[in-house]
Amino acid sequence: MKQLSDVKFSTLDLVPVRENGSPAQSLRNSLDLAQHVEKFGYTRFWVAEHHNMDGIASSATSVLLGYLAGGTSTIRVGSGGVMLPNHAPLVIAEQFGTLESLYPGRIDLGLGRAPGSDQMTARALRRERSGSADDFPEDVAELVRFLGPRTPDQRVIAMPGTGTNVPIWLLGSSLFSAQLAGERGLPYAFASHFAPRFMHEAIRVYRNHFKPSAVLDKPYVMLGVPLVAADTDEQADYLATSVYQRILALMRGQSLVQRPPVKTMDGLWLPHEREAVGDFLGLAMVGSPQKIRAKLEVLVEQTQADELIFTCDLYEHADRVHSYELLAQVMKG
């Protein structure tokens, strides 16, 4: 049985844009956060692809990863993830092959099958391409081929990319990706940071369908976890109101720019909205280090996850850095 100290811990950054802030500052904050969590002992620093969202500045994922990798030295950097229906597999192979060539042994390629946007934005991204989520298994296989060794009959190659064998992860919030990751023998990251409802079933499906591969001899599970750590439970509860406001805005179709914390959410949400936000953040770790340690120990005991990746979208950058620092102390015991 795994203990908390056996589990790797990583960072997922959505590169949040705050109220009256700028994307430029958000991108600089992302690098600063990566540099800090590298010192704190985190395994990876991933960024997520989202489009047409005014509160998230990580749309050009591979470009941002080059910036992050260039400003750090040891931490792995990667996509959490690239939404493959938006892209031709060859282009992704070339982009991540370039990153791997520049920063060998430090690049991860996490793949999702959702567009990471609304239908109108998805059409704007793809233009005349006919790609869709239905093509995902075939696109993953094509990407694996482009990043693997060149075969004698291969007429189209990724350069850079061929032979780099960039580690590929499958990401998802449904059972489809869990089964596919298992059948392909790939590591699996479940999006429990926003869809915890199917977490246990997805882990079961992945492990039951797992077939050893050239990259993995046994299943490897990563779970997404929302984080708000502070010195006291009261301070964490206060800081978390920025997160609640952001999720509430998402559900209402409103601006996603980060808003400052408030003393109370009363009057900001209706009872059914409070319940919906609570479901969305069902796995959230909010509190002091002592409180978070107890909750994480239960999570690891129940899931036997190999790695946890934490997302922390607080209004003040310094509060985010401190939250990750406190978590590192918890994870290291």
Residue ranges and their predicted role:
Residues 13-28, 82-89, 162-172, 280-289:
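Active-site mouth loops of central-metabolism enzymes
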Residues 1-72:
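N-terminal beta1-alpha1-beta2 module of alpha/beta enzyme domains
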